[in-house]
Amino acid sequence: MSLDISQFPVLAQANTPNELRQLPQALLPQLADELREFLLKSVGMSSGHFASGLGTVELTVALHYVYNTPFDRLIWDVGHQAYPHKILTGRRDRMHTIRQKNGLHPFPWREESEYDTFSVGHSGTSISAALAMAVAAEKEQAGRKVVAVIGDGAMTGGMVFEAMNHAGDLHNDMLMVLNDNEMSISENVGALNNHLAQLMSGRLYTTIRESSKKVLKGMPVIKEMAKRTEEHLKGMVVPGTLFEELGFNYIGPIDGHDVDALVETLRNMRSLKGPQVLHIMTKKGRGYEPAEKDPIGWHAVPKFDPSQFKKPATKPGLPTFSQVFGKWLCDIAEQDEKVLGITPAMREGSGMVEFSQRFPKQYFDAAIAEQHAVTLGAGFACEGFKPVVAIYSTFLQRGYDQLIHDVALQRLPVLFAIDRGGIVGADGPTHQGAFDLSFMRCIPNMVIMAPSDENECRQMLYTGYCYDAGPSAVRYPRGSATGATQVEAMTALPIGKGVIKRLGKRIAMLNFGTTLAAALTAAESLDATVVDMRFVKPLDVDLVKEMAQTHDVLVTVEENAIMGGAGSGVLELLQKLKMPKPVLQIGLPDEFIKHGSPEEVTHDLQLDAEGMLAQINAFLAD
């Protein structure tokens, strides 16, 4: 159910950027207030990313007011902050469907709107894409402008600086808006700095600046002196030296919640030549007190009543696999001070809050820099430490070369705790953990484990901790554990050995991971054997051979891409053993998995017990 737009009289007049640009500038502050209120209520109805969008309301209004979108290109890095953008670009009446099956995409998505010029979800991609679009715009000579909006968190990734280094060299016209919500230099925000930014972006200043460069071109000594003088004067009030060194003209920081100042500064900057940086200061969660006080806790929210000023109480229930990992990490750190926990900026999501507080000297947040996080683990392993890299499946993709070159090639004992393996759900195709078993299985020296429940998860983590012949990975899903009885004593499992969970006839289901419960349910109707394979690599050769010899049909089950996954490993083994056998592979299809609740996606892909049974019966009927 959508909100009554009559309660938002100015927002009602701005369903598209064209309509927004028809409004008098005097109405923009009221529009921003109404947009923030609409965002607050709509996310309360639907769930979704919350605090980031509250902080970019004024910026979104100003950008669409000054720039001729979608002709001018606007790219949002990551996309958590883009809900106001969606509201102002014709999707207002569908905001209550965001992140839901067949609803609006959780991030900017090219297939959804012409205003979404680049599909996003992972951080640090915006500057590279914007640079390419800026080069294309220059070739077209149509007067197109290009803007990228990136947060200070994403600025910790190396790809951003690679792109900025290239942009500074090419010197195409583009604007990078740095949305800084960490308040690290808040003393520079205010009327004086807003005024300074408008002066520095104004035509008189830039004309004098560029003319002076031409005059001084033939006098390098004086030119260098003038440059240093300018940098010194600017450096007294602005922290832009790094950007200037990379070839960008730096403006700011200015108040990112002053829509009039943003409009005037953006108008000035729109005509500037070369790469530009506008540094704005914002507050994550702006306008909603609980989110302002706890922006991390309010980063993403379930459905809630904004009038209650609190999120709904979490119902007591089973721990999540992330919490199971976090507790294990604390338990093992109590015993071994050489255990080091590494995360690429996912402390909360990976269950490492308690570990970071209890063992601060053993905790390393590498920021949004997955390549660095993986090689950091490799370096620690070289020095005899026990590094544990906690990382989401989708983000391990970003450190793949380091996994091969820096870890596996050297047989370094780095343990990878891979969270969000398999179906993630509402965050959609950019975040589904669909590929990790496939891209890790082909790497020599890797040991890969897939626990079927939380107790097995603990034992496998301990197995990886004890394994010193090379890297190991334990891959587990998002969400609640299964309720298995936890065995406190930790025992290293025999490498490459599975266990039979149910003896049946004719059909043997070889299960990898937490799909075991559904496989057991399906097996009841089929009277099938069920094996908890435990290890994706190395496979239990003897057990696979036994199942092939004693059953007519094998079924592999995994929550990973079928192509190259665990089932492919079973087929490769059977071929090597010269044991031809009908094999049905159940897993994720060769497509990017759309957003929806995990239950909906699992059902649609026939990965629940009902779907498995249907797939097996259809296979047997052929």
UniProtKB/Swiss-Prot annotation:
GO molecular function: 1-deoxy-D-xylulose-5-phosphate synthase activity; magnesium ion binding; thiamine pyrophosphate binding
EC numbers: 2.2.1.7
Cofactor: Mg(2+); thiamine diphosphate
CDD domains assigned to the protein according to its UniProt record, in alphabetical order: TPP_DXS, TPP_PYR_DXS_TK_like
UniProt GO BP: 1-deoxy-D-xylulose 5-phosphate biosynthetic process; isopentenyl diphosphate biosynthetic process, methylerythritol 4-phosphate pathway; terpenoid biosynthetic process; thiamine biosynthetic process
Keyword Magnesium: yes
Keyword annotations from UniProtKB, A to Z: Isoprene biosynthesis, Magnesium, Metal-binding, Thiamine biosynthesis, Thiamine pyrophosphate, Transferase
Residues annotated to bind Mg(2+): 152, 181
Cofactor note: Binds 1 Mg(2+) ion per subunit.
Gene Ontology cellular component annotations, sorted alphabetically: cytosol
Catalyzed reactions per annotation: D-glyceraldehyde 3-phosphate + pyruvate + H(+) = 1-deoxy-D-xylulose 5-phosphate + CO2
Sites where the protein binds thiamine diphosphate: 80, 121-123, 153-154, 181, 288, 370
Pathway(s) annotated for this protein in UniProt: Metabolic intermediate biosynthesis; 1-deoxy-D-xylulose 5-phosphate biosynthesis; 1-deoxy-D-xylulose 5-phosphate from D-glyceraldehyde 3-phosphate and pyruvate: step 1/1
Subunit structure: Homodimer.
PANTHER family referenced in this protein's UniProt entry, alphabetically: 1-D-DEOXYXYLULOSE 5-PHOSPHATE SYNTHASE-RELATED, 1-DEOXY-D-XYLULOSE-5-PHOSPHATE SYNTHASE, CHLOROPLASTIC
Described purpose of this protein according to its UniProt entry: Catalyzes the acyloin condensation reaction between C atoms 2 and 3 of pyruvate and glyceraldehyde 3-phosphate to yield 1-deoxy-D-xylulose-5-phosphate (DXP).
Family stated for the protein in its record: Belongs to the transketolase family. DXPS subfamily.
Protein name, as recorded: 1-deoxy-D-xylulose-5-phosphate synthase
Encoding gene (name): dxs
